[in-house]
From Swiss-Prot:
This is Undecaprenyl-diphosphatase. One of its GO terms (molecular function) is undecaprenyl-diphosphatase activity. Catalyzes the dephosphorylation of undecaprenyl diphosphate (UPP). Confers resistance to bacitracin. The chain crosses the membrane at residues 88-108, 117-137, 157-179, 191-211, 227-247, 255-275. PANTHER family: UNDECAPRENYL-DIPHOSPHATASE (PTHR30622:SF4). It is a multi-pass membrane protein. It comes from Pseudarthrobacter chlorophenolicus (strain ATCC 700700 / DSM 12829 / CIP 107037 / JCM 12360 / KCTC 9906 / NCIMB 13794 / A6). Bacitracin is thought to be involved in the inhibition of peptidoglycan synthesis by sequestering undecaprenyl diphosphate, thereby reducing the pool of lipid carrier available. The keyword Nucleotide-binding does not apply. One of its GO terms (biological process) is peptidoglycan biosynthetic process. Its EC number is 3.6.1.27. Pfam families: BacA.
Length: 277
């Protein structure tokens, strides 16, 4: 067991999950520079994301409790479905459908061919440029009370793009939000809430497979993965507050340049054979 490696990967997961730079890409990249030079694997990535998503639940627990109560009340007919919190509950469910369906349909590709470092590098650059355009041209006038069901499903398809490492779940959803005219902070908040069902679903499914039958694939076993998950939770909790404050006053330009630089650096490293695809 290499506890230093998994601690580092947990730190990376916590630092990058909520930033629009793709945590799965960073786990894939950092894995290449560790002594065993292996991909940590889709299962390791999904399970460690349980840590960062638990940080979302803890950070937003008041909002989540309020939304769940209102949504449950709307099911029972005690609360109007037009109640802002009840609507948010339905919007999160609606927005989660694309990633659930596409994740199941393309599970084999997601866990194999789509983890190619060439694809990671390309997605970092392409979606970095799209984020730059969205940040520049988005009107940034709408808040979450103006979120429509149509926009909710579009957010959902943007989130589903993050099944490809390098796209970034938060980056995809934030980009979609900006293009639809939402403020930076509103786009980020809905991105956090929207991720809860998808990330918990994926992580718990992978955990079930590990515990019940398959065993974890990749270089790290369940104890190491558990440590990485705990570290990801602690670091992720800190990052959420920082990121929301950052985007309330600053543009996403810093993340755009970082994505482009990292993507180009990966092309060079792959081209010269320093790392393998």
């Amino acid at each position: 067991m290499n506890w230093f490696e998994v601690a580092l990967l947990g730190l990376v997961q916590g630092l990058t999950e909520f930033l629009p730079i793709s945590s799965s890409a960073h786990l894939r990249i950092v894995g290449q520079f560790l002594p065993n030079a292996e991909d940590p694997g889709a299962a390791f990535t999904a399970i460690t994301q349980l840590g960062t998503e638990t940080a979302v639940v803890v950070y937003f627990w008041r909002d989540i409790v309020r939304i769940v109560k209102a949504w449950a009340g709307s099911l029972a007919g005690k609360v109007s479905r037009q109640d802002p919190d009840a609507r948010m509950g339905w919007l999160v469910i609606l927005g989660s459908l694309p990633i659930i369906v596409l994740g199941l349909l393309f599970q084999d590709q997601i866990e194999s061919v789509l983890r190619s470092m060439w694809i990671v590098a390309t997605m970092l650059i392409v979606f970095g440029l799209i984020l730059a355009v969205a940040d520049a041209v988005g009107k940034q006038e709408r808040d979450l009370t103006q979120l429509t069901y149509k926009h909710g499903i579009l957010y959902g398809f943007a989130q589903a793009m993050a099944l490809i490492p390098g796209v970034s779940r938060s980056g995809g959803t934030i980009t979609a939000g900006l293009l639809m005219g939402y403020t930076r902070e509103a786009a980020a908040r809905y991105s956090f809430l929207l991720a809860i069902p998808a990330v918990f679903g994926s992580g718990l499914y992978q955990l079930y497979k590990v515990v019940s039958k398959d065993g974890i694939t990749g270089p790290y076993g369940l104890p190491e993965t558990a440590l990485a998950t705990v570290i990801a939770f602690v670091v992720g909790y800190v990052i959420i507050g920082w990121f929301l404050k950052f985007v309330s006053t600053r543009s996403y330009r810093l993340f755009v340049w970082y994505r482009i630089f990292l993507g180009l650096a990966l092309y060079l490293l792959l081209g010269f054979g320093v790392i393998s695809a």
